[in-house]
Amino acid sequence: MSSAKKIGLFACTGVVAGNMMGSGIALLPANLASIGGIAIWGWIISIIGAMSLAYVYARLATKNPQQGGPIAYAGEISPAFGFQTGVLYYHANWIGNLAIGITAVSYLSTFFPVLNDPVPAGIACIAIVWVFTFVNMLGGTWVSRLTTIGLVLVLIPVVMTAIVGWHWFDAATYAANWNTADTTDGHAIIKSILLCLWAFVGVESAAVSTGMVKNPKRTVPLATMLGTGLAGIVYIAATQVLSGMYPSSVMAASGAPFAISASTILGNWAAPLVSAFTAFACLTSLGSWMMLVGQAGVRAANDGNFPKVYGEVDSNGIPKKGLLLAAVKMTALMILITLMNSAGGKASDLFGELTGIAVLLTMLPYFYSCVDLIRFEGVNIRNFVSLICSVLGCVFCFIALMGASSFELAGTFIVSLIILMFYARKMHERQSHSMDNHTASNAH
């Protein structure tokens, strides 16, 4: 690409912010309402952590580019960590897809109020998963083409609320909503971090291609941090203004928080329009992400990390069996979480459970990438910024883990250890195969 066509820092920052912002924010205000305006500190900590992680990945992309991103970086520390990261990453993605599905269902509750209840919401989400599984099996590449349109549509009410919503902001309402978590301020902040981080999951892929940027070694890391920070500021403004516009009980009970703010700002006609836009955005995003999960399974199978069935593709390159297996797992988890919440709660409770699990599963891959940058660049003054961002990224992973419930944390830890057991089995099979080949060659 000629130098004249390459983009500079300002444009690059805009691209990163656009890549970062999406449907992840759409249902967060309902979950954060149960914590309160104090979640602003959770946002600030999350932004610092996300910017640090963004720098780590941008630095690794420019200094040590590897096919496979976090999986490759973890593998540079230890092949066992690479295997573990590949499995964790795959499962985090399909679990995250369920959260996107629940967001779509929640915004559809504007038209079908029964979808605010966990059981109907769970059933609807499972139905959506299977519909898009079959769409992708038939070759639904057209779905991904609609994703960009959907993301623009979902961001309109978010940005509008962040900018215009302050006209309806009430300081007394905000003060009453400061800490609604029935716990100490410190615990409320830590609890909010796990939720806030959901909006930044995907930070590892936000960096733009170095080939389209002027002076990429300087511009890409800086733009990635600035773009992540810009997205975070929009998130803070949008969620904090809602804390001053409505009582926490209204937001917590809402299945479509930005539809409510749009109706206040523009009139009642806007709520169904925003709900339809957001549901459309989430559905197109889900369709696109489901195919990406299927392709991730193919890569893992080709690397020898997953059973061969995941790597089987048809004449069109579609991993039908992998898509079906992912849909079965998504259905099983959705049934389990729906049953756990069936005694009471809302669709947003399902969202909170799913995002918590998905975020926790990404913490080890993020941590390994930070450690790999320290390994690659060393501990010295010359690479001071890289060292600080790597350490901050590691600390942020620890803080996010602290915000998890004991059940979520224990589950993540157990799954991580079970993966290493499978790795040991894989190594045994590889060694046995190698010894058999060696014996056969000696016999000849």
UniProtKB/Swiss-Prot annotation:
Spans within the Cytoplasmic topological domain: 1-6, 56-94, 144-148, 214-221, 294-322, 375-383, 426-444
Regulation acting on activity, per entry: Uptake of cadaverine at neutral pH is greatly inhibited by carbonyl cyanide m-chlorophenylhydrazone (CCCP), which dissipates the proton motive force, valinomycin, which dissipates the membrane potential, and nigericin, which dissipates the transmembrane pH gradient. Cadaverine uptake at neutral pH is also inhibited by putrescine and lysine. Cadaverine-lysine antiporter activity is not inhibited by CCCP.
Primary subcellular site in the record, as a coarse category: membrane
Residue intervals annotated with topology Periplasmic: 28-34, 116-122, 170-192, 243-272, 344-353
GO biological process: one example: cellular stress response to acidic pH
Result after altering residue 43 to L: Strong decrease in cadaverine uptake
Annotated localization: Cell inner membrane
Substitution effect: residue 41 to L: Moderate decrease in cadaverine uptake
Reported impact of residue 89 to L: Strong decrease in both cadaverine excretion and cadaverine uptake. 10-fold increase in Km for cadaverine for cadaverine uptake and 5-fold increase in Km for cadaverine for cadaverine excretion
Mutagenesis / variant outcome for changing residue 55 to L: Moderate decrease in both cadaverine excretion and cadaverine uptake
Membrane topology: Multi-pass membrane protein
Effect annotated for changing residue 423 to L: Strong decrease in both cadaverine excretion and cadaverine uptake
Protein name: Cadaverine/lysine antiporter
Keyword field contains Transport: yes
UniProt KW keywords: Amino-acid transport, Antiport, Cell inner membrane, Cell membrane, Membrane, Symport, Transmembrane, Transmembrane helix, Transport
Record note on domains: Amino acid residues involved in both uptake and excretion, or solely in excretion, are located in the cytoplasmic loops and the cytoplasmic side of transmembrane segments, whereas residues involved in uptake are located in the periplasmic loops and the transmembrane segments. The SH-group of Cys-370 seems to be important for both uptake and excretion and may be necessary for recognition of the NH(2)-group of cadaverine.
Gene that encodes the chain: cadB
Chain ranges passing through the membrane: 7-27, 35-55, 95-115, 123-143, 149-169, 193-213, 222-242, 273-293, 323-343, 354-374, 384-404, 405-425
Function of the protein: Under acidic conditions, in the presence of lysine, functions as a cadaverine:lysine antiporter that facilitates the excretion of cadaverine and the uptake of lysine. At neutral pH, also catalyzes the uptake of cadaverine via a proton symport mechanism, however the physiological relevance of this uptake activity is probably negligible because the expression of cadB is low at neutral pH. Cadaverine uptake activity is low at acidic pH.
Species per Swiss-Prot/TrEMBL record: Escherichia coli (strain K12)
Gene Ontology CC terms: plasma membrane
Induction comment from the UniProt entry of this chain: Part of the cadB-cadA operon, which is under the control of the Pcad promoter. Expression is regulated by CadC. Highly expressed at acidic pH in the presence of lysine. The global regulator Lrp also has a positive effect on the expression of the cadBA operon when cells are exposed to moderate acidic stress in the presence of lysine. Repressed by H-NS under non-inducing conditions. Repressed at pH 5.6 by OmpR.
A GO molecular function held by the record: lysine:cadaverine antiporter activity
Similarity comment: family membership: Belongs to the amino acid-polyamine-organocation (APC) superfamily. Basic amino acid/polyamine antiporter (APA) (TC 2.A.3.2) family.
Effect of a null allele: Mutant shows reduced amount of cadaverine in the medium.
Result, substituting residue 303 to N: Strong decrease in both cadaverine excretion and cadaverine uptake. 24-fold increase in Km for cadaverine for cadaverine uptake and 9-fold increase in Km for cadaverine for cadaverine excretion
Effect upon mutating residue 76 to Q: Moderate decrease in both cadaverine excretion and cadaverine uptake
